[in-house]
């Protein structure tokens, strides 16, 4: 009898142990199980050093991404659809340090990345930081095409002065997005190498094309209450390896207000600097006086304003079919490439939480971005910040 009882106890203990081990391994490997949802079967896995995201960053992304996406959809005449956020990821320098920002892909119902939310720490000396707004948000198509190209692959996204790179598991580094540079001399003296150091210590990945269910919307729940933009604004070109941001800006604005396609950045720069050749021409910029002069030469009464234009001013000028050029200076550093930058105002809007925003086109990007109308600090796609210190309006 004792032998039978001992045998039964042994069997029960073995069963309990096997059950516990099974639960443990199922839990431990849950992330590696294949997804049943077809949209998730091919996911882009981006390498990250850790997945720690501050609560303030999560809250900002959750609360503001959908209204800004709805606005960009409307401004670009995209059909409204439901969206969700993918897993947050980071971008690294070649020394393996993060660029300091947090990135969330915005996915449509098919699982494609349509936009990217960039959340960056505000500079300590900025107006937003002094108001205890520790982070700023920007939504644009930045890197969306790149992430879609690497579906079902594991990559590390790297950046330096030359642009953005994808490092694949076979060790191949590919330049996927070029960053414009302001002058050839600075570029040649850049010390960053495009040969990455050992990145094997990056143990975790973010499945950026895998929806985060807690942020998923069953429909386009947010909408833009009011959108006012230059009727014929189109993005026909983006800035390459040159210093022609002002040329791109004025071309886009004049093409919009004249409803034409005859302006382009190179022809504008050639008109203003006819005697320059080669590298001197490619890496020349424009002064505010030259921008004023060109606008007036094209029949526009362009005017200089020594500050950011207000929301109401943008609204009135846009309604009157008058373009505005943003003159910005980089907050992080006044030296080197991208120290000064021009951008175009495409319009203004109110989203359904009552927030006033200004639609801006950065010549580096292939889409518009949303700027808080109460802040003169513009966070651009790569995480830098520009102080909107002056405007030229009337294009």
From Swiss-Prot:
It is an enzyme of class 3 (hydrolase). The keyword Protease applies. Its EC number is 3.4.22.-. Residues 1-30 form the signal peptide. Gene3D superfamilies: Cysteine proteinases, Staphopain proregion domain. It comes from the Bacteria. It is found in: Secreted, Cell wall; Secreted. The active site is at residues 245, 341, 362. Keywords: Cell wall, Hydrolase, Protease, Secreted, Signal, Thiol protease, Virulence, Zymogen. Proteolytically cleaved. The keyword Protease applies. One of its GO terms (biological process) is proteolysis. Pfam families: Peptidase_C47, Staphopain_pro. The record marks 221-222 as: Cleavage. Residues 31-221 form a propeptide. GO terms for cellular component: extracellular region. Cysteine protease able to cleave elastin, insulin, myoglobin, fibronectin, fibrinogen, HMW-kininogen, alpha-1-protease inhibitor and alpha-1-antitrypsin. Along with other extracellular proteases may contribute to the colonization and infection of human tissues. Belongs to the peptidase C47 family. This is Extracellular cysteine protease. It comes from Staphylococcus epidermidis (strain ATCC 35984 / DSM 28319 / BCRC 17069 / CCUG 31568 / BM 3577 / RP62A).
């Amino acid at each position: 009898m004792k032998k039978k009882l001992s045998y039964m106890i042994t069997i029960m203990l073995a069963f309990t142990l096997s059950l516990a081990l099974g639960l443990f391994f199922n839990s431990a490997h849950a992330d590696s199980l294949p997804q049943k949802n077809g949209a998730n079967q091919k996911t882009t896995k981006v390498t990250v050093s850790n997945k720690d995201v501050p609560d303030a960053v999560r809250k900002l992304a959750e609360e503001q991404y959908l209204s800004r996406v709805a606005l960009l959809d409307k401004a670009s005449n995209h059909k409204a659809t439901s969206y969700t956020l993918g897993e947050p990821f980071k971008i690294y320098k070649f020394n393996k340090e993060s660029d300091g920002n947090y990135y969330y892909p915005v996915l449509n119902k098919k699982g494609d990345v349509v936009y990217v939310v960039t959340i960056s720490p505000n500079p300590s000396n900025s107006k937003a930081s002094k108001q205890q707004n520790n982070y700023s948000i920007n939504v644009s198509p930045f890197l969306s095409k790149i992430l879609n190209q690497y579906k079902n692959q594991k990559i590390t996204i790297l950046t330096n002065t030359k642009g953005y790179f994808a490092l694949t598991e076979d060790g191949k580094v590919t330049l996927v997005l070029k960053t414009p540079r302001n002058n050839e001399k600075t570029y040649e003296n850049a010390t960053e190498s495009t040969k990455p150091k050992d990145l094997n210590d990056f143990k975790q990945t973010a499945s950026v094309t895998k929806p985060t269910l807690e942020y998923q919307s069953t429909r386009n729940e947010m909408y833009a209450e009011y959108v006012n933009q230059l009727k014929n604004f189109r993005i026909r070109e983006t800035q390459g390896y040159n210093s022609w941001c002002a040329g791109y800006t004025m071309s886009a604005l004049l093409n919009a207000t004249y409803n034409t396609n005859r302006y382009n950045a190179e022809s504008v720069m050639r008109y203003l600097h006819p005697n320059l050749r080669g590298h001197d021409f490619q890496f020349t910029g424009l002064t505010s006086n030259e921008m004023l002069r060109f606008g007036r030469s094209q029949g526009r009464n362009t005017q200089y304003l020594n500050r950011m234009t207000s929301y109401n001013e943008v609204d009135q000028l846009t309604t009157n079919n008058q373009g505005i050029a943003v003159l910005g200076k980089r907050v992080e550093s006044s030296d080197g490439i991208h120290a000064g930058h021009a951008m175009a105002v495409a319009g203004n809007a109110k989203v359904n939480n009552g927030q006033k925003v200004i639609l801006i086109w950065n010549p580096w990007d292939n889409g518009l971005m949303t700027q808080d109308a109460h802040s003169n600090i513009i966070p651009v796609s790569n995480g830098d910040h520009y102080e909107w210190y002056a405007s030229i309006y009337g294009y």
